[in-house]
Design a protein with these regions (language model features):
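Conserved SGNH/GDSL esterase-like catalytic core that processes O-acyl groups on lipids
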Residues: 105-271, 447-448, 452-455
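Mobile gating loops/cap/lid regions near enzyme active sites that modulate substrate access
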Residues: 301-359, 366-417
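Catalytic nucleophile-elbow at a beta strand-turn-alpha helix junction centered on a G-D-S/GDSL motif
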Residues: 88-105
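Bacterial Sec-dependent N-terminal signal peptides
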Residues: 13-82, 441-458
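A short helix->loop->beta-strand "cap" motif at the edges of active sites that frequently abuts
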Residues: 282-286
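Histidine-centered active-site loop/cap adjacent to the catalytic His
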Residues: 31-32, 120, 360, 364, ...
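Positively charged n-region of N-terminal signal peptides that target proteins for export
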Residues: 1-4, 19-20
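Bacterial N-terminal signal peptides
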Residues: 6-14
Length: 458
């Protein structure tokens, strides 16, 4: 493990005597980066929650036309071996922010409508798949953040403040109750294991779960949210996105995370965390499960790059920088061509060993694929999909180029979760996987037409 402080460039006599054109670029400040205290509900945005990263407030109204797209007929759907002749597909979804529809660092109605489970349900012709939407009046939900200038070299954000759902303070904070039926049980910072064990009131998923389900506070009780789901839903197909949010949350523990933080279940019993998934699938239900993308493919981990400060060969142990207000100030003050000598605390640096711990391709993704094989699940290899998007080589079947950069069309302003277009791309990957595994014929979303129909602009 790296030492507490990492020097990106060793100080040498030649550096001290450098010319004016290469003056040392040493950044130090004593600023306290306060988190926005006006928010009773902790922000889902990894960086915009800091006041120093906000440039102001903005009022935003829904701009994408979901109903215009959703009202279109899909055509014939052949479910292949998903269900028997004459049987109906009844689908639920579990998981984290991707499945819940987190976008731009918030959970709000427009993001929920375009979440990939809702898009997949449309393509499957399922009219009874329900999302726990925020109300039409509280359409901005938890609130969210938009890039102040999407074309800027380094990001800052504006805070969306209008038509938000009222939050009651407490532990946990309380959001308005969703009164309808739901088929999507995913929550931000969530996974199916929290549907099994929901007794911790201080965990971030709780306010979102409590909107549409009743958390069971007695850990010794046989009751759980999963018990409620199984009692109230006769589902036979499940969308499972269980591990990505854990990966993102664990990355923020640097420099204190270990191999076990990411791969503890493999260390302990040689498999993925599966007890809740096993219970959800205990009647032989079919479905899909996602692999975990590598963090390097996210704009979140590319807002501030080592390569812009120094030649990577100068400090081969330093792999990635964790976004933070202090790091932002370093990049804003750094003068191209100057020598960079600022001392960085280890909390900002993901070194080569830590990066290897966090690589899901080494251990966890193979185990996800093994689990899928044993349980007759289709696999959406999100690791491979995000690698292609990151490399700039992803083009949809209808010829639409997908851009995974900060200035691109796939990721929203939180640098982690997709835009509406990105969710449609994920939905198509889900459909690819389902059709391949179960010999079904579910129509893909025509991305070019989707973009035109909903009025997406990026």
């Amino acid at each position: 493990m790296k030492i507490l402080y990492a020097f990106l460039l060793a100080l040498t006599p030649s550096l001290v005597a450098c010319s004016q054109e290469t003056l040392p670029d040493t950044v130090s400040d004593d600023l306290v980066d306060a988190i926005d205290s006006t928010e009773l509900l902790p922000s889902l945005h990894p960086l915009a929650r800091f006041l120093s990263m906000q440039t102001g407030e903005i009022q935003v109204h829904p701009s994408l036309n979901f109903e215009n797209w959703n009202s279109q007929k899909v055509g014939n759907v052949d479910f292949g071996s998903i269900v028997g002749a004459g049987e109906k597909v009844e689908m639920i979804a579990v998981g984290g922010g991707l499945t819940a529809g987190v976008c731009n660092g918030g959970l709000y109605r427009e993001g929920q409508l375009f979440a990939y489970p809702n898009l997949v349900a449309h393509q499957m012709g399922l009219t009874d798949f329900e999302m726990p939407l925020f109300s039409e009046n509280d359409f901005n939900g938890t609130g969210y953040y938009l890039y102040d200038n999407p074309l800027a070299k380094y990001p800052k954000w504006k805070k969306v403040t209008n038509n938000r759902a009222p939050v009651t303070g407490g532990v946990p904070p309380v959001l308005p109750k969703y009164e309808g039926n739901t088929s999507n049980f995913a929550t931000p910072v969530g996974s199916s294991q929290w549907l099994k064990n929901s007794d911790r009131e201080d965990l971030m998923f709780r306010p979102y779960l409590a909107r549409f389900a009743t958390p069971h506070d007695d850990d010794n009780s046989p009751e759980s949210v999963i018990t409620d789901i199984k009692r109230d839903h006769s589902y036979n197909f499940v969308l499972i996105d269980d591990f990505f949010d854990h990966w993102i949350e664990t990355m923020q523990l640097v420099p204190n995370f270990t191999f076990g933080n990411f791969n503890g279940s493999i260390e302990q019993y040689g498999d993925i965390v599966k007890y809740s998934i096993n219970e959800i699938l205990n009647q032989g239900q079919k479905g899909i499960i996602f692999t975990v993308p590598h963090f390097r493919t996210l704009p979140y981990m590319n807002w501030f790059k080592f390569s812009e400060l120094l030649d990577p060969s100068t400090n081969p142990d330093a792999s990635y920088l964790m976004p933070a207000p202090f790091i932002s100030r370093i990049f804003e003050q750094h003068k191209p061509g100057s020598k960079f000598t600022t001392r960085l605390d280890a909390i900002y640096v993901v070194d080569a060993q830590e990066a290897s711990f966090a690589d899901p391709a080494s251990f966890y993704n193979p185990k996800i694929k093994d689990y899928a094989q044993r349980h007759n699940l289709a696999v959406v290899d999100l690791y491979e999909v995000y690698e292609r998007i990151h490399a700039g080589s992803y083009v949809t079947d209808d010829g639409y180029a997908i851009d995974g950069t900060m200035k691109g069309n796939f990721f929203s302003s939180d640098g982690i979760y997709p835009t509406a277009l990105g969710q449609a791309v994920v939905a198509n990957e889900v459909i690819y996987a389902i059709n391949s595994k179960y010999h079904s014929q579910i129509p893909l979303i025509n991305i070019s037409e989707f973009v035109k129909t909903i009025g997406f602009k990026k």
